């Protein structure tokens, strides 16, 4: 069995049929085989294939179908009397083709207009429809529905109101490719797209005229029913048989003859005829079909107008598959067509292969700088190391909200998003407006590639700052989500012609082609699936006669900006001069690259994030000290960067390639709190916006007690306590009026209340459980305000929404300075200050006094200092303060600061510090010990490492240090050495410390910390011993200038300078926090139908449905087993007095009296006159059982018997009516997750999240500025005299070693004031000033633009169960549910009426004694059962909440009456419940009816006695064993019996109150007494 046909093969076969007249396989029989006559075909050579449904469905041979003669055409078949169906294998032995045309000539009947029915349907082997054509009489439309490839249904709807005018119509449905079209009376009604569908399998049945709901045949008349295997044959069909006058002989009967061969007229309109596009099939070159296709096209061309003479409006050229096969000359290109309507969205193409690596940086010419392209965005990096901690600067006040910025220009289209999940099954929306009809042709030839457009106009935005050169591209980021399609933009200018490409591969078939008005020759099809990427093309041949390329179409509007990608891995910048050999053993740390050239000014950006802080406002009132937050979680170390790739050269010219870094990744994980130096005092910010609503204040003073409310309704009774002490004997109860005779020991109705008794002793039971809360009383007036209460514990609820802005408050008083707060976040960089006033020129200081001693010997190496705080800021960069750490994970119950925590993890090194001041020369130490032999080779590597990590620390070329084994002679002056270990190497150690700590574990001993900063000069050493007098030295050269004096004390803080001019624009800030979610986007276009989801888990039980319809009576159940006696229940509550019941049944017969003594035997007297009937004699002894007598006649209906014993569960009855709503059940267990629902509407914007933690440290900064010059060396020794009087100018000498300090000179005169100095660098941060006063609240700013849509938040925790909702209005009647499970066996029916009196039986044997205890127990149980039912009835009338909240509060005020709820939607039928467990044994039933009469006994031996007087009735016999008879009809009301004599005196009653359960059964349920004022019922 062929399950699917390739559309290409199918079309191929069709063309083969048309060209050669061959049969299309064996799937479609020929018209000769089927008896099909295409009388109106204009092409006799066309071979018609298809199926004659009238023949294949045996309609002519079915006797139930009425045949009516038709003088104008074929017989009329009146369907509807019998189902029209046949197995699919008989109708379509090899299945139905993918493309076909269904032709039906029908007349619909009026009584079918109320139904929805299938005109044509093919089902599968399981009875599910594979394809169906449904008539929707309500909407006057046809719906074609077929099974899609993913198992769901694909469908399209055609409005056809003309079918319902009670006249004959020819209906033609053609399915070709992805398009379905409907023609009514040879006029196109509509064409609709049809999704991909499965092929029709021959496993099921074919139906004509089937009711969709009841499955019955539908009545309509039929003349013609057949299927063509070529969907185009509907154009060859004529409609003469349904036209009133038929067709004139000279008129063409085919619509195709009236049109061009390739143009299809769809519908006459006011502006003229509308034609669809010409279609040509494209097949592979040199295939066998080309000749056939060309042959057929040439035949058609011969039948139409010659096309080589130019094409008119009604003509189309034949399809030229290549220039070699056709000599067609095309005319000049037409005018530019108007903007076409937007086509239907094509299905998404297959995912393209990964593209080749793109070029990175290109050198256009040898002298030009590198032009670099931004690399792809990297993935999100891991958390960076902890940033350098800094002390917080004083926080300025919040600035005023800036003015709303101008709206940015529309952004460029976003990157394509990831493929969405398959959509859920969508319900077909409301019927759309009638679209323009049109057939879809085969796919057109691939167009020539258009010329590239000119570059667009430059953007309007300000020029961006020059970008830093980037590193290698990061790994490919995840695919962003799809942006919303933007509107179409204006068309670009025509571009210069590009290199033409070769012909691309064949594309997929096109979708529905919208029809265009006449004269529009620039036809454009709907977009198909994106084809695979074509190979680079060769130059296209310039054939003569081809038209010029049309103008480029309008450009669409850009889409909404795409989602931000994840953060890439950090990479160092690469410069063009860095090779791989410079990176050393530490991969991934590149040196800073050269600054890139300024980019072309970009377009104006979207609205920016929050602006920088304004000028600092006046200091605010000090806030209360906040608790010190716990240290944040240490972030994971980021992965090292890949080494910079070597520069690659391209072959096409002198181009060099350098990677630039990708865009910045997202903000990393928060770092720990920093501990850096305090920042400078920021300027006061502008007045801030009104803050969010503050936390709730402390509770107020408790109010005075309010007025006592009205008493609430009494609660439900508590659990019964233990029995109290026995009371005194009460008065006897009166007998219940409804019980007579032997039942007098049952308690009677309650009497009037007696006098109030003395209070009894206190009970000894436990207190009962609290009763249900009473209904709230009437709300009392509010009490006076109470006194100030104690502050409550901190709340634990979620943060509430921001309240409305309050009115502006008065400024508060100056508070006391608070304690130092936790480190604050770094403030924004302030504006450039204006230069301060020029200071006065100070006097020249006097030279220092003192005699310079001889140089001391070098001292020994001091002990290693304590590890100081590492701070390695990059030279020339400010020291940044760290952001405060993220809030701790746990909130304590107290808001007091906790104890001192353990020391935090050492922070990462900061950037290199600023150069220190010139230190004071130290004293020479003692001579050192000879050094050990150094390992050559390690130091250069270490130096290289340090250089790569810390920057160029040496400020010049470094010399390898000399490795001394023993003291040698003094060498020449060396080049300045590498800076000490304490600045650069400690940075390296600090960076490597976390790895070492991870490898070492938590409990191992820590490594020594970084070396501290240079210490202050130590105290002067003790004077050394006087040395031997040396020889007098030569007069030395003048000494160098003395050392710089010690740093003076810090001066007083200067006056605040004037406000400076605005500084240059700062660098772009970090990305701001994510804005609130945006407004809901524009509703997207409908997606393709997604695959059906897997069957979901069973959902939670649905709410109780509405009452169903009355079900039929169930069959009579079998008799159930006798239940055991239940235990005696607790004493019930005092009930209301019941109504007097109806008269009770006659009492049981009295006990048989003792037989009297036998009298003397009398002689037989003469037969006297028949006397009157004597009194009944005493009962004789029971006789032996008699022989089974014949069955008596059916007796009259007896009276209702007593209830029988509980029978066995009967078979399941039909579903009964739905009962009233039951009590609210307890909250069920959480259900299993249901299937994914439809996408909901976007929710409201969420509340602002907590501030994010500090970001990870940035990449290494650029190389710092050169350091200050070194110290002057000592003067060298004089050289020998020169050869001549004047020597040549020598090279500049190497600076000599530093000389000893010269003798102090005489104090000089004060010098002239020097020129004013350059403005000094920023001084150290000043002390924290006192906080300013609280500023006034500013007015609320204007409403900001809606932010972009926020990311989807994580699923919240499961909320607590809500309060039960009020009952909704009753919904409409739901559909009838499936048959329920078997019900329990019904109770036995009521006994039938009493039969006719039978023949008197023989006296029975002595019966058992009547057990009155059983009778009393039974009556008591019945009464208790009635009481329970009455209690349940009253309880259901009370509107108490069935569940009490877990933490009950005080009763609230009474709520207002709620408005009646809207009717709820009808619930879906519930699933059949599980079969219940076997019930407990029921109560014993009432005594059974007397058994049937026994068989007649054998005739006894003895002398026949005389006829005695009729004996009294015998005692009750044992129960019989006959089967229960059928329920008899209701008997008539019997005559009231004679009142019996009063019974004997009953036994004394039990002590205590009357048990209401003994009397309650007499109260009818339907009536109610008004409550007595002196009594209270169960609910007061």
Swiss-Prot record:
Expressed in most tissues examined with highest levels of expression observed in heart. Strongly expressed in cortical and medullar regions of kidney and more weakly expressed in lung. Also detected in the ciliary muscle of the eye, on the serosa layer lining the muscularis externa of intestinal tissue, and in the perimysium membrane lining both the cardiac muscle bundle and the smooth muscle tissue of the small intestine. Strongly stained in particulate or granular structures. Not detected in brain or skeletal muscle. Residues 486-495, 1362-1371 have a biased composition (Gly residues). Residues 50-231 form the Laminin G-like domain. The keyword Protein biosynthesis does not apply. Residues 375-509 are annotated as: Triple-helical region 9 (COL9) with 3 imperfections. Keywords: Cell adhesion, Collagen, Extracellular matrix, Glycoprotein, Hydroxylation, Repeat, Secreted, Signal. Residues 375-424, 590-643, 676-725, 797-848, 1006-1063, 1210-1263, 1350-1407, 1448-1500, 1504-1552 form the Collagen-like domain. Residues 232-374 are annotated as: Nonhelical region 10 (NC10). Residues 1410-1448 are annotated as: Nonhelical region 2 (NC2). Residues 571-586 are annotated as: Nonhelical region 8 (NC8). Glycans are attached at residues 47, 327. A motif (Cell attachment site) lies at residues 555-557, 1000-1002, 1206-1208. One of its GO terms (biological process) is cell adhesion mediated by integrin. Residues 934-967 are annotated as: Nonhelical region 4 (NC4). Residues 1555-1580 are annotated as: Nonhelical region 1 (NC1). Prolines at the third position of the tripeptide repeating unit (G-X-Y) are hydroxylated in some or all of the chains. Residues 324-547, 585-935, 995-1405, 1445-1523 are annotated as: Disordered. Residues 587-640 are annotated as: Triple-helical region 7 (COL7) with 1 imperfection. Residues 871-881 are annotated as: Nonhelical region 5 (NC5). One of its GO terms (cellular component) is extracellular region. Residues 733-747 are annotated as: Nonhelical region 6 (NC6). Its main location: secreted. Residues 525-570 are annotated as: Triple-helical region 8 (COL8) with 1 imperfection. Involved in mediating cell attachment and inducing integrin-mediated cellular reactions, such as cell spreading and alterations in cell morphology. This is Collagen alpha-1(XVI) chain. It comes from Mus musculus (Mouse). The gene is Col16a1.
């Amino acid at each position: 069995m062929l399950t699917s046909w390739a559309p290409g093969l199918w079309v191929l076969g069709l063309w083969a049929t048309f060209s050669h007249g061959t049969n299309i396989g064996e799937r479609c029989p020929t018209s000769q085989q089927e008896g099909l006559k295409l009388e109106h075909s204009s092409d006799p050579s066309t071979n018609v294939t298809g199926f004659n449904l009238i023949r294949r469905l045996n309609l002519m041979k079915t006797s139930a179908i009425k045949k009516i003669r038709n003088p104008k055409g074929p017989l009329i078949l009146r369907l509807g009397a019998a189902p029209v169906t046949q197995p699919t294998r008989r109708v379509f032995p090899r299945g139905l083709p993918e493309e076909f045309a269904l032709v039906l000539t029908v007349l619909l009947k009026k009584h079918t207009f109320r139904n929805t029915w299938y005109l044509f349907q093919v089902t599968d082997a399981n009875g599910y429809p594979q394809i169906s054509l449904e008539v929707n009489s309500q909407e006057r439309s046809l719906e074609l529905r077929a099974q899609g490839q993913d198992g769901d249904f694909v469908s399209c709807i055609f409005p056809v109101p003309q079918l319902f005018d009670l006249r004959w119509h020819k209906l033609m449905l053609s399915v070709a490719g992805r398009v379905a079209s409907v023609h009514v009376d040879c006029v196109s009604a509509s064409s609709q797209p049809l999704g991909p569908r499965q092929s029709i399998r021959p496993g099921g049945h074919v139906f004509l005229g089937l009711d969709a709901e009841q499955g019955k045949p539908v009545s309509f008349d039929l003349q013609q029913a057949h299927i063509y295997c070529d969907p185009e044959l509907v154009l060859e069909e004529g409609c003469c048989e349904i036209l009133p006058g038929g067709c004139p002989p000279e008129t063409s009967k085919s619509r195709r003859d009236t049109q061009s061969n390739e143009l299809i007229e769809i519908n006459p309109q006011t502006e003229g005829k509308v034609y669809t596009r010409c279609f040509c099939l494209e097949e592979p070159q040199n295939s066998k079909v080309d000749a056939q296709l060309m042959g057929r096209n040439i035949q058609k061309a011969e039948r139409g107008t010659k096309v080589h003479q130019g094409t008119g409006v009604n003509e189309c050229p034949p399809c030229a598959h290549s220039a070699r096969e056709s000599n067609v000359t095309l005319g000049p290109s037409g005018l530019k067509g108007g903007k076409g309507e937007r086509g239907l969205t094509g299905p998404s193409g297959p995912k393209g292969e990964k593209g080749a690596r793109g070029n990175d940086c290109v050198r256009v010419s040898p002298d030009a700088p590198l032009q670099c392209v931004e690399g792809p965005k990297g993935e999100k990096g891991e958390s960076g190391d902890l940033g350098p901690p800094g002390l917080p600067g004083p926080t300025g006040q919040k600035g005023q909200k800036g003015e709303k910025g101008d709206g940015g220009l529309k952004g460029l289209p976003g990157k394509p998003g990831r493929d969405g999940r398959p959509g859920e099954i969508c319900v077909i929306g409301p019927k759309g407006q009638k679209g323009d009809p049109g057939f879809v042709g085969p796919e057109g030839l691939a167009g020539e590639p258009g010329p590239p457009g000119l570059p667009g106009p430059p953007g309007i935005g300000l020029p961006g700052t020059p970008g830093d050169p980037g590193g290698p591209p990061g790994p490919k980021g995840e695919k962003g989500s799809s942006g919303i399609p933007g509107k179409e933009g204006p068309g670009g200018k025509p571009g210069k012609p590009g290199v033409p490409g070769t012909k691309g591969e064949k594309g997929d078939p096109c979708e529905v082609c919208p029809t265009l008005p006449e004269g529009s020759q620039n036809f454009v099809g709907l977009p198909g699936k994106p084809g695979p990427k074509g190979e680079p093309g060769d130059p296209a041949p310039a054939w003569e006669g081809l038209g010029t390329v049309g103008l480029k179409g309008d450009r669409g509007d850009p889409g909404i900006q795409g989602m931000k990608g994840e953060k890439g891995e950090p990479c160092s910048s690469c410069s063009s001069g860095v090779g791989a050999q410079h990176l050393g053993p530490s991969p991934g740390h590149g040196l800073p690259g050269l600054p890139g050239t300024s980019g072309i000014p970009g377009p104006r950006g979207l609205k920016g994030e929050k602006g920088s802080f304004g000028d600092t406002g006046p200091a605010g009132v000090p806030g209360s000290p906040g608790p010190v937050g716990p240290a944040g979680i240490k972030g994971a170390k980021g992965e090292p960067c890949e080494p910079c790739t070597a520069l690659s050269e391209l072959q096409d010219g002198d181009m060099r390639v350098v990677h630039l870094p990708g865009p910045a990744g997202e903000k990393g994980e928060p770092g720990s709190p920093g501990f850096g130096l305090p920042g400078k005092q920021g300027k006061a910010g502008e007045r801030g916006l009104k803050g969010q609503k503050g936390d709730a204040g402390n509770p107020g003073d408790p109010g005075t007690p309010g007025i006592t409310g009205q008493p609430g309704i009494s609660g439900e009774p508590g659990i019964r306590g233990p029995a109290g002490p026995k009371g005194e004997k009460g008065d006897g109860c009166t007998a219940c009026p409804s019980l007579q005779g032997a039942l007098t020991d049952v308690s009677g109705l309650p009497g009037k209340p007696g006098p109030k008794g003395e209070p009894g002793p206190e009970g000894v039971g436990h207190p009962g459980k609290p009763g249900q809360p009473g209904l709230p009383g009437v709300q009392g007036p509010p009490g006076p305000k109470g006194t100030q209460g104690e502050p409550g514990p901190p709340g634990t609820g979620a943060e509430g929404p921001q309240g409305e802005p309050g009115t502006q408050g008065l400024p508060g008083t100056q508070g006391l300075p608070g304690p130092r707060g936790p480190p604050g976040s770094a403030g924004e960089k302030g504006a450039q200050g204006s230069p301060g006033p020029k200071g006065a020129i100070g006097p020249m200081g006097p030279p220092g006094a003192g005699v310079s001693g001889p140089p001391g010997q070098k001292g020994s190496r001091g002990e290693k200092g304590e590890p100081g705080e590492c701070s390695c800021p990059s030279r020339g960069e400010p020291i940044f303060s760290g952001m405060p750490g993220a809030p701790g994970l746990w909130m304590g119950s107290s808001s007091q600061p906790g104890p001192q925590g353990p020391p935090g993890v050492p922070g990462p090194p900061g950037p290199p510090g600023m150069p220190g001041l010139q230190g004071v020369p130290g004293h020479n130490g003692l001579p050192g010990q000879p050094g050990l032999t150094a390992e050559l080779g390690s130091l250069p590597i270490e130096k290289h490492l340090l250089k790569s990590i810390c920057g160029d620390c040496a400020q010049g070329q470094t010399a390898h240090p000399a490795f001394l084994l023993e003291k040698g002679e003094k060498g020449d002056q060396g080049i300045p050495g590498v800076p000490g270990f304490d600045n650069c190497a400690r940075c390296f150690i600090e960076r490597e410390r976390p790895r070492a700590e991870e490898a070492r574990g938590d409990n191992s001993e820590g490594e020594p910390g970084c070396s501290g900063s240079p210490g202050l000069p130590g105290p002067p050493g003790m004077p050394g011993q006087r040395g031997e007098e040396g020889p007098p030295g030569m007069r030395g050269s003048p000494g160098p200038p003395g050392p710089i004096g010690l740093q003076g004390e810090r001066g007083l803080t200067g006056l605040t300078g004037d406000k400076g001019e605005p500084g240059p624009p700062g660098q772009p800030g970090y990305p701001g926090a994510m804005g609130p979610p945006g407004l809901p986007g524009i509703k997207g276009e409908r997606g393709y139908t997604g695959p059906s989801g897997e069957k979901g888990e069973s959902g939670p039980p649905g709410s109780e449905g509405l009452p169903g319809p009355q079900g039929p009576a169930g069959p009579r159940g079998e008799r159930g087993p006798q239940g055991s006696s239940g235990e005696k229940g607790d004493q019930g509550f005092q009930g209301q007095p019941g109504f007097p019941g109806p008269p009770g049944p006659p009492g049981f017969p009295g006990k048989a009296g003792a037989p009297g003594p036998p009298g003397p035997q009398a002689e037989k007297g003469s037969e006297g006159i028949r006397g009157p009937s004597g009194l009944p004699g005493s009962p004789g002894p029971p006789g032996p059982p008699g022989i089974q007598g014949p069955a008596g006649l059916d007796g009259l209906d007896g009276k209702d018997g007593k209830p029988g014993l509980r029978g066995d569960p009967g078979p399941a009855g039909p579903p009964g009516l739905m009962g009233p709503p039951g009590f609210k059940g307890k909250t069920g267990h959480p259900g299993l997750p249901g299937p994914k629902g439809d996408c909901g509407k976007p929710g409201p914007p969420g509340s602002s999240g907590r501030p994010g933690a500090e970001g990870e440290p940035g990449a290494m900064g650029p190389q710092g500025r050169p350091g200050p010059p070194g110290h002057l060396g000592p003067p060298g020794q004089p050289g020998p005299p020169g050869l001549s009087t004047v020597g040549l100018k020598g090279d500049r000498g190497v600076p000599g070693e530093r000389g000893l300090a010269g003798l102090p000179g005489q104090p000089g005169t004060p010098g002239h004031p020097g020129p004013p100095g350059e403005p000094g660098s920023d001084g150290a941060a000043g002390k924290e000033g006192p906080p300013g006063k609280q500023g006034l609240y500013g007015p609320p700013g204007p409403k900001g633009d809606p932010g972009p849509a926020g990311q989807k938040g994580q699923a919240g925790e499961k909320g607590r169960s809500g309060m039960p909702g009020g009952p909704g209005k009753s919904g409409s009647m739901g559909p009838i549910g499936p048959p329920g499970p078997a019900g329990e066996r019904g109770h036995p029916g009521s006994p039938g009426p009493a039969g006719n009196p039978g023949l008197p039986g023989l006296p029975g044997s002595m019966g058992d004694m009547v057990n009155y205890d059983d009778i009393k127990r039974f009556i008591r149980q019945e009464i208790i059962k009635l009481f329970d039912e009455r209690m349940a009835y009253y309880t259901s009338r009370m509107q108490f909440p069935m569940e009490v909240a877990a933490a009950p509060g005080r009763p609230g005020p009474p709520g207002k009456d709620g408005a009646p709820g809207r009717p709820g939607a009808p619930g879906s039928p519930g699933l059949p419940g599980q079969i219940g467990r076997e019930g407990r044994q029921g109560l014993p039933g009432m005594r059974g009816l007397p058994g049937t009469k026994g068989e007649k006994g054998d005739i006894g031996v003895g002398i026949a006695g005389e006829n005695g007087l009729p004996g009294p009735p015998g005692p009750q016999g044992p129960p019989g064993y006959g089967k229960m008879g059928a329920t008899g009809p209701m008997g008539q009301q019997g005559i009231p019996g004679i009142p019996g004599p009063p019974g004997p005196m009953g036994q004394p009653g039990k002590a205590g109150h009357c048990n209401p359960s003994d009397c309650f059964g007499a109260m009818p349920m339907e009536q109610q007494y008004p409550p007595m004022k002196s009594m209270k019922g169960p609910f007061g």
